[in-house]
Amino acid sequence: MPVLRSIRARLSAEQPLAGVRIGACLHVTAETANLVLALRAGGAEVHLCAANPYVTQHDVAEALGEHVHVGDYRDGLAAVAAAEPDLVLDDGAELIAALHGSGLRGATEETRSGLVHLRTLDVQCPVLAVNEAASERGINDRFGTGQSALDGIVGATHMLLAGQTVVVLGYGWSGLGVALRARGAGASVIVCEVDPIRALEARMEGFEVLPSLEAAARGDVFITVTGSRDVLRAEHFTRMKDGAVLANAGHFDVEISLADLRALAGDRHAQALPLVEQYEVEDGRRLNLLARGQVVNLAAAQGHPAAVMDVSFALQALSAVHLASADALAPGVQAVPASIDDEVARLKLVSLGVEIDVETPGQQAYRGRWSPA
């Protein structure tokens, strides 16, 4: 993770987080460990709990040592909250929701679903929307989720995607990435959306766009990428083909209604493969649920490649420094400063050995004429 490594070296030299206590609710993986070590190098005391205990890498948690809580999800949140952090780095917004009114100096949120939730609250501290940074959306969501979700599905099932009909529910940046990668693997892709702008974009990209109930009868593989709940439910399950595969690449295990699936199957379910539960509905059709409905790229694969998380966690680290050092920021969800976004992108380009052009003074002056004051 060369970008985060360069940031860690700078933080170690400058100590901008000295005396700052950080609470983090993130997936406990080797990549996250590099973020924690960078923050510690900058002087911070970091308390970490697992955003999803099912995907925790316990050897990583052990290696990180003190202030790491990887048991029950709620117990972990409570332990980090009890540390009374100054800053919070969150994946899902539950830690922010619990602490934003208790004197937090600031927070960051990694997920779209978390930001949707926070925008319904009267948040009492500044929250930097890391998920909406340009470098995050372009790299993490589009390329990271696009690749790792399919890694999880293929790894769990050993299926050939070519020739399959893949239904992608949700066409944000992550859904776009999943749809593009599935098409690249030879699948026919149907997109289902509730947002007319995104649905139009999907159609103009060449994907078939259908209501989810129509798509339910045609799909071989269903991938939810919405950040919402009950996206696939009983009315969809009753229309699906025998052998349909159900995977969640969104957030938490609520996008596929497990209650509806279990109600339809009763006791007719079995472990077909280590990460595949097969549910047989009354007419004999078998529906295959991957990784208990958990996030498939983490629960059935290794998550995003380190090269992707390098960008995400570089944004997190520099955002934490910004929150710790900036003068009083207004409360509420707000953009990551463009200067941080640009710096991370430039560092990533350097790590790839890529050089780009620089505007001439004349070009800068010309563009400046049209820039808002």
Residue ranges and their predicted role:
Residues 1-17, 48-56, 61-164:
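Glycine/serine-rich phosphate-binding loop and adjoining beta1-alpha1 elements at the start
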Residues 1-5, 18-21, 29, 126-163, ...:
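Adenosine-phosphate binding glycine-rich loop
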Residues 6-9, 13-16, 93-98, 217-218, ...:
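Rossmann-fold NAD(P) dinucleotide-binding segment
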Residues 50, 88-90, 101-113, 237-280, ...:
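ADP-ribose/adenylate-binding Rossmann-like module
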Residues 43-45, 103-104, 123-125, 186-187, ...:
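A short helix->loop->beta-strand "cap" motif at the edges of active sites that frequently abuts
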Residues 25, 91, 223-226, 248-249:
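Short, well-ordered coil/turn residues at beta-beta hairpins
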